[in-house]
Amino acid sequence: MTLYIILFFIALCTGMALSVYTFGTGGKRKHIFQNIYFSVEDTDGVGVLYTKTGEYSAVLKIENPVQKYSADIDSYYDFTHLFSALAQTLGEGYALHKQDIFVRKQFANEPEHNQEFLSASYFRYFNGRPYTDSLCYLTITQEAKKSRLFSYDSKKWRDFLVKIYKVRDLLRDSGVQVKFLNKAEASEYVDRYFAMNFKDRTVSMTNVKADDETVSMGDKRCKVYSLVDVDCAALPSLIRPYTNIEVNNTEMPVDLVSVVDNIPNAETVVYNQIIFLPSQKRELALLDKKKNRHASIPNPSNQMAVEDIKQVQDVIARESKLLVYTHFNMVVGVPADTDLQKCTNHLENAFGRMGIHISKRAYNQLELFVSSFPGNCYSLNEEYDRFLTLSDAAVCLMYKERVQHSEETPIKIYYTDRQGVPVAIDITGKEGKNKLTDNSNFFCLGPSGSGKSFHMNSVVRQLHEQGTDVVMVDTGNSYEGLCEYFGGKYISYTEERPITMNPFRINREEMNVEKTGFLKNLVLLIWKGTQGTVTKTEDRLIEHVITEYYDAYFNGFEGFTPQQREDLRKSLVIDDRNSSEKRHESERERAVRIEGIIDEIEGRRKELKVEELSFNSFYEYSVQRIPDICEENRITGIDLSTYRYMMKDFYLGGNHEKTLNENMDSSLFDETFVVFEIDSIKDDPLLFPLVTLIIMDVFLQKMRIKKNRKVLVIEEAWKAIASPLMAEYIKFMYKTARKFWASVGVVTQEIQDIIGSEIVKEAIINNSDVVMLLDQSKFKERFDTIKAILGLTDVDCKKIFTINRLENKEGRSFFREVFIRRGTTSGVYGVEEPHECYMTYTTERAEKEALKLYKRELQCSHQKAIEAYCRDWDISGIGKALPFAQKVNEAGRVLNLTTKITS
């Protein structure tokens, strides 16, 4: 019997020990989570949290207003002003509890039905890539009077409702995205904090175990780091809302507490920022009392304390600042088998560099964790967990940044954000939810080797996949692969097969001011050249001839009308009287002579017939008609011989007789992807601008005919038309594109191209609301000129000089970055693409030859060749494209690999 009693006693003790080890010692800690909330209620769509100590809270989900890596110092100060205003709005008896939550996730994209091959490859390439997402919640809590009995105070309740809506409106008016959590969302938010799980779709609860160092739940452990040790508040005397990091010898502002969003090994981080708003009158009295106490015992340390208090009192009196109590802590969650010391070292070192020494005595882990529940902040110990400061200083320690998210837009162009995950932006700046631009024309500048053609391949590929008609003018075979992939039309200029069109062939409805203007520019370009100067008389003369040419074709010339004869008669009489030649004739004889001149002019015009519309017929008409017009209007100084000589090159029998006389392939208007390759004539001072102008007119016609989105991309060929002669036409085209859902883009690599040309500035840049800049390091010494021409701000320049310079390469393939400004909104994005896209865009000859070998050997489509080639490339284990292409070319066959290449 005694043995049974002993065994029972041992079992009882063992059970008690296990219970204490697992669930704590009982008492208050045992029921600590049950004692937080009384209920969650719905009040007009707002979920209100009621605690058992009598406080009630509303939770707003917000998005921090400062874009990460925005480089804008003012935006950090705007944040401090905003939250100081929120504190002023709430006033005594309220607390602001801001929780910034950082969650380590893996990128996942749901494949769309019938997704294009390259887009599917793009998202498959990024699937599983780790990144940090962020969430932000702001809890507004009204303090309850501490007593054993709680009574309902309708006045306080109404005050609470009024103030939470004021806060919501103040945030919204400042451009912050904000919404109240409803009852279900508020309950879920609390559950997720309890489980420290903001990643999974469903949340499961588990037992919590706490010790002096950590709080554990299930398969994760958490440690709470208090930012300030109240017994030894180690903070700098002066604090700003941002700090600077050095990137490429340029200072880049980042959040003062940006270290909390990249803690190593952390799966979840919750940064708790709590501001309590006490009675100002009481706190000032206590401060004054403290000052007097220090002053009563004169010694150096007390004297310093008195001076510090006086300084604070002066600031409060002069600037109406608030005294607030604050608490800051970080709840860092890691997998259960992870050592937290690495997190601790990172935080101590990072904050130490800023002069902030985080508390080393956080033995009350469970209490800190529980007090950080939404709405439960008033359970923080007033003596040990709160410190007094000014509201501005407190707000400086808040987290202010947000990560880049995809924009709401029907046209999605994917880049990577600066941590390497895809985000969609509205490249036009005018089709998304937020309108950023008035037109979608763009200007792209990047030195040779900066990746601008690769970037443009990516942009036009995505535009075309989303229903955009693309026309490109290229001078270096940069888009041959993409054109072949899409099965588009690739037109190369050769002497045997020149790019031709008959710009004079139009119908009566097309005859308008802009068509006349285009033809006038075309004729003047041939006559004068790109750098030639045109007088107003010459300009008017060519316009006059073109008008009469079409009048002769559409209407014919049967003779002058009575009014035309009268006008011509008056003109000839005036000219005759002003003539220096003296004639001895009567008025009647003069009238007869002038009538004879009119009959002669009329006869010559009747003889001028236009049977068909072409350059040939225009040439024939103009060389006969121009002398008559000059004679009729007493025009002098027109060099008709030069006109005939220059125009004749494009006339029947001339070197370029086909260029302006043969009709262009009409199927081009139905093609959705067209590339004009004109590298062979880029050094021809006449053909180069002329053919470029022809292509632009083709795009204009396509722009009017097609109802979908259109884009024209002109690579280096734009230089051919950047002349005073073409300036007005370029302006016209840019402005017209906006009216027909079209964009015109210019891509260049030479800095001198934009510095030395007023035409570029006036006609192109001023009409391009979208600016794209690749790595500008080569131009850094001369960048002030570019800055002035492009209208870049100092903030823009700071961003530009971080291109390809951030420490964000780890775990990523080779990529380039590009600065994009849409209107006044700008950012830096990554151009990172999978092997399939790379092989579609590549201009490297060896790589193109290797891909052609696969296509030829497999006798398959371009897409199938890319699939097979990239499969072997991935299996080979060779990281870079060129070495693998060389292996393929050496083998001279399809590799069909099953294992990694070892040598």
Residue ranges: model-predicted function:
Residues 444:
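Hydrophobic anchor at the beta1->P-loop junction of P-loop NTPases
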Residues 76-89, 261, 356-357, 367-423, ...:
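P-loop NTPase motor domains
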Residues 496-534, 725, 729-827:
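Conserved ATP-driven motor cores of ASCE-family P-loop NTPases powering translocation/secretion/packaging/pilus
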Residues 452:
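Conserved lysine of the Walker
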Residues 2-400:
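Extended, folded cores of ATP/NTP-driven motor/assembly subunits in large transport
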Residues 448:
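The conserved Walker
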Residues 455:
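Hydrophobic positions on the alpha1 helix immediately C-terminal to the Walker A/P-loop
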Residues 461-471, 486:
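Post-Walker A helix-loop "phosphate-sensing" segment adjacent to the P-loop in P-loop NTPases
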